[in-house]
């Protein structure tokens, strides 16, 4: 395919036009008085949102060079979202400011490579200073503040703080759509996995169609059980003790299943069978997790253990087990606390080492089941459009909260960026163009406060000067139109979000400035096929 080429200033300006189109669409959403953007959907109702990355992902421009610029800034938003989960609008805004100031200097004859060196130097110093002013998150109140600022709702803040308090920092919190109008929280205590009973005849409560077993033994195996003789020795020992049994296996079928059901119906003893969770190697690991949590052993031929040789001390135990058609929940497993801690540490190491997002998510789920629990925030609203918007807000708030717990918090509303400007201004260089790069970052750091003020209907430059003249930590509360101590008032941003937004924006923007040529495909013209003979108008009468 033939290519179209642009060089130098023309290439950079065409790409900058695309950057501006995307950034100007996103920037209107920043701050407590930021607006929403409506996104057209081919199927279903339009999506109304103020989430920067969701908006950026929808934007594709017709002009190929403008689209290149837009896609580069889209990467800033996406990367920030992947790393920190929030701050995508801020990152987009910073990238636009760095590109705008940088191109002015490049046009005036400055060397883009030296400018990039200056930008990197300034960003390193800025990140250092952001970490210096960062404060750790202390307790439920701080968590609620971070979530409330991100979601622009105190109610959501309290909900997320409750969820994190109940499942711990290692717990998994998911956001789902609710069928009711309100937004509520549901917490699953203990270990839950998505496998139900193998036969409905095993239920103990026929009204609710669930089996609840108290003070229960748990047999864990990766084998398929079809012959009752294999598990008869251990069943006899359990019957003698008058206890109940949960069997977790690959499957229970044939003679084994019918015998267990028959004994349950006769009232001889209560046994519930469920299939093992997961597949392949993940199944082996999950069975091992259950074994450690309950203090049992996995009966597997790989480990040289046979079902016929199982003794009572090889079984796991728990205070209670609840089995429904779809889920099994083990509450208060009696496993050794030290062994559980070691297993948790092992999974944490695997999470750090893995590069796959899918594997990371699955490991995080396993960690939560062992260390914390699982909380579900169910989001409800009057219409589907409102529901989607609310769900996105809560997901952002959740990500911001986790980022805050990880690295701490800084004064919000762009105040942290203003507070570190004097430290950036102190940086020097003998090379003029490097100094220009430092100045570009110094100016760009003002941009979030300016935009928050503009969205609130006040003059951004005036607000910036007042914040600069105030003590460190004092910023502009756009919601109430006054200057306050941001940390004390609870207007805070996660350190990780503030840091990531600047690093990602500077990374893409500084590379953008070094562009000297742009290459794009020339769209092919569609050839209209010739008309078939006899299809013309001649000869009609």
From Swiss-Prot:
One of its GO terms (molecular function) is ATP-dependent protein folding chaperone. GO terms for cellular component: cytoplasm. The keyword DNA-binding does not apply. It catalyses: ATP + H2O + a folded polypeptide = ADP + phosphate + an unfolded polypeptide. Its EC number is 5.6.1.7. It comes from the Bacteria. It is an enzyme of class 5 (isomerase). Keywords: ATP-binding, Chaperone, Cytoplasm, Isomerase, Nucleotide-binding. Pfam families: Cpn60_TCP1. It is found in: Cytoplasm. One of its GO terms (biological process) is protein refolding. NCBIfam families: GroEL, PRK00013.1, PRK12849.1, PRK12850.1, PRK12851.1. Together with its co-chaperonin GroES, plays an essential role in assisting protein folding. The GroEL-GroES system forms a nano-cage that allows encapsulation of the non-native substrate proteins and provides a physical environment optimized to promote and accelerate protein folding. Forms a cylinder of 14 subunits composed of two heptameric rings stacked back-to-back. Interacts with the co-chaperonin GroES. Belongs to the chaperonin (HSP60) family. This is Chaperonin GroEL. It comes from Clostridium botulinum (strain 657 / Type Ba4). The lineage of its organism: Bacteria, Bacillati, Bacillota, Clostridia, Eubacteriales.
